[in-house]
Amino acid sequence: MSRYRGPRLKIVRRLGELPGLTRKMAKRKSPPGQHGAASKKPSQYRIRLEEKQKLRYNYGVTEKQLLRYMQRARRAKGSSGENLLQLLEMRLDTTIFRLGMAPTMLSARQLITHGHILVSEQRVNIPSYQCSPKEKISIRSNSRSRKLIEGYMSTMGSIVTPPHLELKKEKLEGNIQEIIDRQWVGLPINELLVVEYYSPKV
């Protein structure tokens, strides 16, 4: 299943706040569609499915990628749900987004694939690259890269940088201090429902 390219606010109306997909908020609170406002108790399957879809749309990953992350999370020690969120949050595109260098995950992904981003002084063009503590995130030393990211940052206003990251705004650099803690995950999500959704599949 490919990444979503359709109307973003339609997804926000259905699933709720998704900061990685768009910073805009839906004016109408009811789900999209002709019968969106009709009250109907959702099934347990639908509740789990929609929670899983929040991860897909917020982090901009495919179903195949998300399944692989879930498999890795299950193999690791500790809570599978928290492991899954940490894997998604420590991606390079998510890190760029959480540092406030890009307004959405898609914008962060484009910065990376177009070669603007360095990790510990080495160019990395893979958005799914897993960042590690003590790595430094910076941009290429050319005016185009700096102008692009400064433009993004000037339009986003005040951004709260999570404690596992350190932003040096003047230098357009960030340091990864540690693996992110669950309480600082940038998405309202019940990861246990996602684990339950994938239980028959992994």
Curated annotation (Swiss-Prot):
Region span, Disordered: 18-45
Coiled coil stretches, renumbered: none
Main location: plastid
GO biological process: ribosomal small subunit biogenesis; translation
Location of this chain's protein in the cell: Plastid, Chloroplast
Domain of life from the UniProt record: Eukaryota
Functional summary from the UniProt entry: One of the primary rRNA binding proteins, it binds directly to 16S rRNA where it nucleates assembly of the body of the 30S subunit. With S5 and S12 plays an important role in translational accuracy.
Gene designation: rps4
UniProt xrefs under InterPro entries: Ribosomal_uS4, Ribosomal_uS4_bac-type, Ribosomal_uS4_CS, Ribosomal_uS4_N, S4_RNA-bd, S4_RNA-bd_sf
CDD domains named in the record: S4
GO cellular component term of the entry, any: small ribosomal subunit
Signal peptide positions (record): none
Family as reported in the entry's similarity comment: Belongs to the universal ribosomal protein uS4 family.
Assembly behavior: Part of the 30S ribosomal subunit. Contacts protein S5. The interaction surface between S4 and S5 is involved in control of translational fidelity.
Protein name: Small ribosomal subunit protein uS4c
Keywords of the record: Chloroplast, Plastid, Ribonucleoprotein, Ribosomal protein, RNA-binding, rRNA-binding
SMART domains according to UniProt: Ribosomal_S4, S4
Taxonomic source organism: Nephroselmis olivacea
Domain annotation S4 RNA-binding: ranges: 90-152
One MF annotation (Gene Ontology) recorded for this entry: rRNA binding
Presence of keyword Signal: no
This protein's record includes keyword Plastid: yes
